[in-house]
Amino acid sequence: MPETYWGKAREFLSKHNLDVGDIIELEKNGIQVKGIIMPTYSNNDDIIVLKLDNGYNIGISVSNIQNVKLIEKKRKEEKRREGAVSTTNSEVMIISTGGTIVSKIEYETGAVRPALTPDEIIEFMPEIKEIARIDAEILFSILSENMKPEYWIKIAEEAKKALDKGNKGVVIAHGTDTMAYTSAALSFSFRKMTGPIVLVGSQRSSDRPSSDSSMNLLTSILVAKNAPFGEVVVNMHGESSDTYTLVHRGVKVRKMHTSRRDAFQSINDLPLAKVHYIDKKIEILSDNYRSKESENTLDAKFDNRVFLLKYYPGLSPDMVEHLISSGIRGIIIEGTGLGHTSSDFYEVFKKASKDGVFIGMTSQCLFGRVNMNVYTTGRLLQEAGVVPLEDMLPETALVKLMWTLAHENDLDRIKEIMLTNLAGEINYIHHYEMFPRWYHDRIRLQ
């Protein structure tokens, strides 16, 4: 049964006894098309997806198809177990949580699945053998938008097990959309680490010529084995070409583009390292990193009764009051500029603070730090109990608050922890180089 299809497309495939992985030939509008039926993620219920011989996928409406012929039924997939694949004396453990970074497309069956075994990963990228002995595990296979705090805990526990077994580092394959949330969660959860935990993803799927999968994975393994720091980091393309990746601190990184391969950038911080793909060398860019420890200490728990509030002109205090009455324990505000909302929120925030709700302020600008002492509105909001959170990214502040609330109930103690630099999330000194200047009069658009 074509499980990924629905509506008219599903009816068409069922009528002709076709399934994902079958090779078919069909005729429409006098044109014959041959290909493998692939899974679909389209919202259109009358489209089927075929993988052509040239490797490209096309979508075809099932309406008015004149003829369809089965060329070959799909080949049965070999049964594969999920879980750890035992490799003695591994140096780097690869933990897959989803995404396309280590996915393998089986054109014989139309299936897309994670590359499970170390042998498959090495087949995917033989150069790995020259870098490290690896082990691999599928923890779960989910889209990153479906990531949850309880999954962060499982990832942290598996990463600790891998480090405790003697691996020099851990690579976590993760979808890119929520990778920064997970990297922040792991950063706060690990108090001590014997080696790096490297989150890596892919902006382009592994079946595309422009895929960044291979380079990102290989350089991440290099970082996990050889980097001198004991931190949670994100390693992704540093530019649009295939020359180097950048290693970002897990609490100071953000996805800043929807599709570019170099979408991830350090915000209010410099990358920790630059990894040269051709030379397979790590260039340390900052000595301000957490050193490796002799043991791994994990404290992973989160309270998700929080809310990330983006202020905008016209936001009603009544809406925020209703939100607070829902039982949340904390709010992170993305305020304007130096950290502002309308002064109309003074009474709402004051009451919430008295009721024990933590309210922290970050900036929509992302770059720079909040300073609520400059203007009257900022000073009033502080009087109401709003806490300025330095140069923390909104998403990082949200995850930190979830971690803090799981450990403390006293509001004063919560404020104290939120203003304590636990994992490098607060940078007290900003340099000129930390702000990217995207335009220097060098490009003239025609």
From Swiss-Prot:
E.C. designation(s): 6.3.5.-
Boundaries of every Asparaginase/glutaminase domain copy: 90-421
GO terms of biological process kind:
amino acid metabolic process; regulation of translational fidelity; translation
Which key words tag this protein in UniProt? Answer: ATP-binding, Ligase, Nucleotide-binding, Protein biosynthesis
* Family note: Belongs to the asparaginase 1 family. GatD subfamily.
Function according to Swiss-Prot or TrEMBL: Allows the formation of correctly charged Gln-tRNA(Gln) through the transamidation of misacylated Glu-tRNA(Gln) in organisms which lack glutaminyl-tRNA synthetase. The reaction takes place in the presence of glutamine and ATP through an activated gamma-phospho-Glu-tRNA(Gln). The GatDE system is specific for glutamate and does not act on aspartate.
Its quaternary organisation is: Heterodimer of GatD and GatE.
PANTHER family per record: 60 KDA LYSOPHOSPHOLIPASE, L-ASPARAGINASE
Q: Protein name, please? A: Glutamyl-tRNA(Gln) amidotransferase subunit D
